[in-house]
Design a protein with these regions (language model features):
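A short beta-loop-alpha structural element at the N-terminal edge
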Residues: 1-17
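Active-site rim helix/loop that mediates acceptor-substrate recognition in acyltransferases
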Residues: 26-53
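Short hydrophobic/aromatic beta-strand or adjacent loop that forms the aromatic wall/cage
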Residues: 47, 140-146
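Conserved beta-strand in the GNAT
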Residues: 51, 57-67, 78, 83
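Conserved acetyl-CoA-binding loop-helix of GNAT-fold acetyltransferases
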Residues: 84, 90-103
């Protein structure tokens, strides 16, 4: 059975999750480990990390952090590191994950989330709206930032 797991409630998965996100995005494993540990130990609303799991296999995941490496520090918090394993794509997993996280964050008192991406037409399916262009840290080109407000 496929389930969405809140890493805050499953600290035993922190090392595996940090390594998985590192393998998908190439950001140092220590950065993920530190953010996931903060999620588990700090009890603040941000950061948060989530995995989609089937038995012991990670099918996908994402995080919620203050800023996903862009110049608009006022647009916070940001969904980051959205990834679904290739063989599990086109099955609605990303949409379920996004909806779950938006609802979970609303329960924590956060109804507006932002997401930086160069994808077009994917996030719109899940009620995300293009807000503006932002400058990524160290990036030569501007990229899109989307907004989602949970009603």
């Amino acid at each position: 059975m496929i389930e969405i797991v809140k890493l805050r409630e499953h600290g035993e998965l922190s090392s595996i999750a940090a390594e998985w996100f590192h393998q998908k995005w190439g950001i140092p494993v220590e950065a993920y480990a530190e953010s996931i540990e903060e999620c588990i130990n700090n009890k603040k609303s941000v950061p948060q990390w989530y995995l989609v799991m089937e038995n012991d296999a990670i099918l996908g995941g994402l995080g919620v952090i203050e800023n996903d490496f862009h110049n608009r520090k006022d647009l916070t918090p940001n969904i980051c590191a959205v990834y679904v394993e290739e063989e599990y794509r086109c099955q609605g997993i990303a949409g379920k994950m996004l909806n779950f996280v938006c609802m979970d964050m609303k329960e924590k008192g956060i109804d507006t989330l932002y997401l930086v991406t160069d994808h077009t037409s994917f996030y719109e399916r899940y009620n995300w709206k293009l807000l503006c262009m932002v400058q990524g840290d160290g990036e030569p080109d501007m990229t899109r930032i989307y907004i989602h407000k949970e009603m």
